[in-house]
Amino acid sequence: MSSDSSGSGNSIGRRDFLKSMFGLGGLLEASEAQAKSGTGRTIFFWSDLKTGQVGFPTGFMVEAGLPGSVMKIVAAAALLEESLISPNETIDCKGHVTIKGARINCLVAHGKVDAVHAIAHSCSVYFATASKTMSQSLFFDYAQKFGLNSAVGSVKSGLFPKPEKSTAWPYVLGLSPHLHPNALQLLRLSAIVANRGDVPYLHSAEESAQGKARFNLEFSDMTWGRLQQGMQLAVREGTAHKLDPGNKLHVAAKTGTAPLGKKFQSWLTGYFPYDAPRYAFCLGALNGTSSEVAVPRAKEFLFATEWP
């Protein structure tokens, strides 16, 4: 469903394919209202992982929307921490799978993939299959652990639903119209992975962080390691492989694409350098897919900035 790709040679075919995927369950219609209210602009936020200070070179308009495959980070954490799948267990992706009557597609058949490669290549078949026994309550519990229902500084949370007795895969793939995290929450998600759960209070330069509690989340070293490896591999060979040519900044990231009316919105969130994380970032684009817009625009911001 939300299987991202950064290939550009088949952009027209990819767009048609995405439309066919995202048409399931009326998701296109469900996102029409947001499309009409969307600005079509690109937003970019970054944060210092030592001080918690947030920079916003595109302005402080905090968009929220369907997160797409970024939610696979949350799902991977739940799957690994709850032992719903073992770290090295593989699932054979043949390009599609049917879950409770819904056909879920990947852009390509990924073959046998484990958790790390499923994150890197955004394999929807892997996550939909591995999450068949995951309840919405469990997924939301982990989404809450990542702060997707809580404010970031003075900015309120985006839309967060109550669990129902239904399948979790629309949330796992970031395609439910009832879950709309905002850009700062997705920024914090990457900061959490980068710092293995210990993140300073995120704030603007005008806001004091004195006395503010740090964000803390405890997972096993195994889980943190798989999440970090997956995001690193996404930039080296996966859905964000055009983000950091030559591995100059040592970026780790996760892409996400979702419907916005009859078009697409996309996200890219990550951190760098992955061997000693100092910065996290999030880019949101309301006018295209991750391969067409989010990755190239994030690359521009990352390489145009003089990082201390």
Task: List the model feature ranges, each with a label.
Residues 241-275:
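Short, Gly/Ser/Thr-enriched beta-strand-loop segments that form substrate-interacting elements
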Residues 35-59, 281:
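A short, well-structured edge-of-sheet supersecondary motif
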Residues 89-119, 187-245, 307:
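Conserved active-site-proximal loop/helix segments of enzymes involved in bacterial cell-wall
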Residues 267-269, 277-288:
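Short, well-ordered beta-strand elements
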Residues 3-25:
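N-terminal secretory signal peptides and thylakoid transit peptides that target proteins
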Residues 55-70, 112, 152-213:
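Active-site-proximal helix/loop microenvironment
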Residues 90-96, 107-170, 176-177, 181-184:
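Active-site-adjacent helix/loop patches that line small-molecule binding or acyl-intermediate pockets
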Residues 44, 52, 63-88, 118, ...:
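Active-site SXXK
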